[in-house]
């Protein structure tokens, strides 16, 4: 019988333990369904492609000036946010499928998310606009602008933390998606903060360990053959960083989905049975349900 981790503490080690448990359980989902790593990989590839495409236009726009650089930046922010959200939504859909005992499919999850393109476009437009506002405030010489940006950034992060699960699982409008994401964060703020701190710390630790291993593995080769050894070191470190990025994004996607499913459905995914969701944000009265309904996938906007 699995030991359930109580999650009500707010200290450093409590949050680290919370993050470790969620990371471990999420990694278990990745172990059983490694294809989930494909979604952040595709998101990263598309982001790099568009960064390359927009590099020259950005340089030219900065030379021309007159605000043209913000127009090009808006376009870049929009397309990168769109594809990042699209593949993140597909990951959330696939994770939910895995939570309910079915084998997720990359193609089927992407096909399912095609029905949510409208909300994704709306979100991408709003996100790109906010990013431009952030950039304007960042470039301002007014000290008050920096303070406003910092405060706004915190509020924006909180309000949009669950935006992707909301887009996937609910029929939402441009305003209601933010209301639903914000209310879900409010209901799970304790675990969300704990998970955020713990998962980030643990993934960074894993990344550092992988980089150290990569360097250690290349040292003997570099000692004997400096040229090839240096190339090997660069390649291994790059692979370690890419894997760390994929792991981080996938773990976050799975953990967010688990938190959302519990917060909205009262159902504990079986892959997280050793984690005590009953104390989410101190809401001990919101116990996870068990029984026949626990194997039922939540009704989603896609399925309606």
Where are these regions (language model features)?
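Hydrophobic alpha-helical membrane segments
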Residues: 1-304
């Amino acid at each position: 019988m699995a030991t359930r981790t109580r999650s009500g503490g707010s200290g450093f080690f409590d949050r680290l333990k919370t993050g470790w448990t969620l990371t471990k359980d999420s990694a278990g989902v990745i172990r059983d369904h490694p294809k989930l790593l494909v979604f952040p990989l595709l998101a990263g590839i598309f982001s790099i492609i568009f960064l390359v495409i927009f590099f020259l236009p950005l340089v030219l726009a900065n030379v021309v000036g007159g605000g043209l650089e913000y127009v090009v930046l808006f376009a870049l922010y929009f397309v990168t946010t769109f594809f990042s959200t699209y593949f993140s939504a597909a990951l959330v859909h696939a994770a939910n499928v895995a939570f309910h005992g079915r084998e997720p499919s990359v193609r089927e999850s992407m096909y399912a998310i095609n029905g949510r393109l409208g909300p994704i476009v709306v979100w991408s437009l709003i996100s790109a606009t906010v990013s431009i506002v952030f950039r304007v405030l960042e470039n301002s010489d007014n000290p008050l602008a920096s303070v406003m940006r910092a405060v706004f950034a915190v509020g924006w992060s909180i309000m949009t933390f669950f935006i992707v699960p909301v887009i996937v699982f609910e029929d939402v409008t441009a305003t209601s998606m933010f209301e639903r994401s914000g209310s879900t964060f409010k209901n799970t703020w304790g675990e969300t903060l704990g998970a955020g701190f713990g998962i980030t710390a643990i993934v960074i630790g894993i990344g550092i360990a992988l980089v150290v291993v990569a360097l250690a593995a290349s040292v003997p080769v570099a000692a004997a053959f400096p040229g090839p050894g240096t190339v090997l070191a660069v390649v291994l470190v790059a692979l370690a960083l890419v894997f760390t990025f994929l792991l981080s994004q996938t773990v976050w996607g799975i953990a967010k989905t688990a938190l959302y499913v519990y917060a909205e459905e009262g159902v504990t995914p079986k892959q997280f049975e050793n984690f005590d969701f009953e104390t989410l944000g101190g809401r001990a009265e919101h116990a996870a349900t068990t029984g026949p309904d626990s194997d039922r996938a939540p009704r989603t906007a896609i399925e309606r």
